[in-house]
């Protein structure tokens, strides 16, 4: 058992493979686990295990995702790989599988293809900041100049979408050769180089407890003679008794209040942190000043907004979504954290309508402000059922 305990002491990072169909994402994922398993750092998965990924339901959307885990000397990784292109699109937009960084797989024999571009664009929209490139199938390219050309193309493509194309690590190799010869030092060198690049280039993510305090309010009640209690699950940061916080959302104004008590499982605490379900006792707040759908947050860390741009995946009929397209000016409900707010949608210029199964950029104007930042996920609902899933990519006002 001692070993299992040691695993947890390594920093944890979530990554995934992205890139065009048949460029070797799944083969690379299998090769990483097989090569590292040989060094005692993973359980080996073969191609078929990963390829027949189970269907998962995330907010009613069907996504096929394979999860594998492995370690390097320095870190523990959770790695996602999706069999189909549509699965990637859904995964990235819904945030079903969080990625702190990604390995972009490009076939050296083919160069960047349409989905290579699309995955880079989506990654930049949904907040993946770090990409490491694996130029795969290098054994199929005889001319070293051709390899250099493909590498240049990939770097230019990354720069086009605001990634630091010149600085991104690019590793060249053959995932299949490594998978077939996991003990041959020469065959596995590219895999080891890739893991070293991932280790050093993709930073350890900031832990939720290090971020500014934020708690979406789920319920509010009054304790006679003591004040108003707001309950919810702390999403980020740490809260101490005596801290001043702001109530944000549903009104233009923010209201500052002091937390005079924190209760969890009927016990009083001095502090609460990310992941805790708590009741926060607030001084000098009327029951009518605060409601579900607002958030408690560290002063000036988050602001209420009504206009934003979102990247949205529209559910297919088979996923319980709409059976028909919607048009410019469509007014559904937008579900943020704990509440629905009506908003109107403006489609990109030249776009007449959106079909179920599409993913698009849309401009949204809500009728009441919501505490939001870029990267916040939301659902689009109509009569209580989810018809779309999205992420805020830009705050307008």
Swiss-Prot record:
Q: Where primarily located?
A: cytoplasm
UniProt region (G1), positions on chain: 19-26
**GO CC annotation:** cytosol
Keywords from the UniProt entry: Cytoplasm, Elongation factor, GTP-binding, Hydrolase, Magnesium, Metal-binding, Nucleotide-binding, Protein biosynthesis
Which residues does the annotated region (G4) include?
Answer: 136-139
- Annotated region G2: the residues are 60-64
List residues binding Mg(2+): 26
User: Could you tell me where this protein is found in the cell?
Assistant: Cytoplasm
Keyword Plastid assigned: no
Q: What is its EC number?
A: 3.6.5.3
Q: Which residues hold GTP?
A: 19-26, 81-85, 136-139
Domain named tr-type G is located at 10-206
Kindly state which reaction or reactions the protein catalyses.
GTP + H2O = GDP + phosphate + H(+)
The terms under GO molecular function for this entry are: GTP binding; GTPase activity; translation elongation factor activity
Which residues constitute the signal peptide according to the record?
Answer: none
Record-linked Pfam families? GTP_EFTU, GTP_EFTU_D2, GTP_EFTU_D3
Region annotated G3 sits at 81-84
Q: Please describe what this protein does.
A: GTP hydrolase that promotes the GTP-dependent binding of aminoacyl-tRNA to the A-site of ribosomes during protein biosynthesis.
How does it associate, per the subunit comment?
Answer: Monomer.
Instruction: Name it.
Output: Elongation factor Tu
Organism whose genome encodes this protein:
Clostridium beijerinckii (strain ATCC 51743 / NCIMB 8052) (Clostridium acetobutylicum)
Tell me the gene name: tuf1
């Amino acid at each position: 058992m001692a070993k299992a305990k040691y695993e947890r002491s390594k920093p944890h990072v979530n990554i995934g493979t992205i890139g065009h169909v048949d460029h070797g994402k799944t083969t690379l994922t299998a090769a990483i686990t097989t090569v590292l398993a040989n060094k005692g750092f993973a359980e080996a998965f073969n191609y078929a295990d990963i390829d027949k990924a189970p269907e998962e339901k995330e907010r009613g959307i069907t996504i096929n995702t394979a999860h594998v885990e492995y370690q390097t000397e320095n870190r523990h990784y959770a790695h996602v790989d999706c069999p189909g292109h549509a699965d990637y699109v859904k995964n990235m937009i819904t945030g079903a599988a969080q990625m702190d960084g990604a390995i972009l797989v490009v076939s050296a024999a083919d160069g960047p293809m349409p989905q290579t571009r699309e995955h880079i664009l989506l990654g930049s929209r949904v907040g993946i900041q770090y990409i490491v490139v694996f130029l795969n199938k290098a054994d199929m390219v005889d001319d070293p100049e051709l390899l250099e050309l493909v590498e240049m193309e990939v770097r230019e493509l990354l720069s086009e979408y605001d990634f630091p194309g010149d600085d991104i690590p690019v590793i060249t190799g053959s995932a299949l050769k490594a998978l077939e010869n996991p003990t041959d030092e020469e065959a596995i060198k590219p895999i080891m180089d890739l893991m070293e690049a991932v280790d050093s280039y993709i930073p350890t993510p900031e832990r939720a407890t290090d971020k500014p305090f934020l708690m979406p309010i789920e319920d509010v009640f009054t304790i006679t003679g003591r004040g108003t209690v707001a309950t919810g699950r702390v999403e980020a940061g740490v809260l101490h008794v005596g801290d001043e916080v702001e109530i944000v959302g549903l009104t233009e104004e923010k209201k500052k209040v002091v937390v005079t008590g924190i209760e969890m499982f009927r016990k009083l605490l001095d502090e609460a942190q990310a992941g805790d379900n708590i009741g926060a006792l607030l001084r000098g707040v009327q029951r009518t000043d605060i409601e579900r759908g607002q958030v408690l947050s560290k002063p000036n860390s988050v602001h209420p907004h009504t206009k934003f741009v979102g990247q949205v995946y529209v559910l297919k009929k088979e996923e319980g979504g709409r059976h028909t397209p919607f048009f410019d000016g469509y007014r559904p409900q937008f579900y943020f954290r704990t509440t629905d707010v009506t908003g109107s949608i403006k489609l990109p210029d030249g776009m007449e309508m959106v079909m179920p199964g599409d993913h698009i950029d849309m401009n949204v104007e809500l009728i009441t402000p919501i505490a939001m930042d870029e990267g916040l996920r939301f659902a689009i609902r109509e009569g209580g059922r989810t018809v779309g899933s999205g992420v805020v990519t830009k705050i307008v006002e």
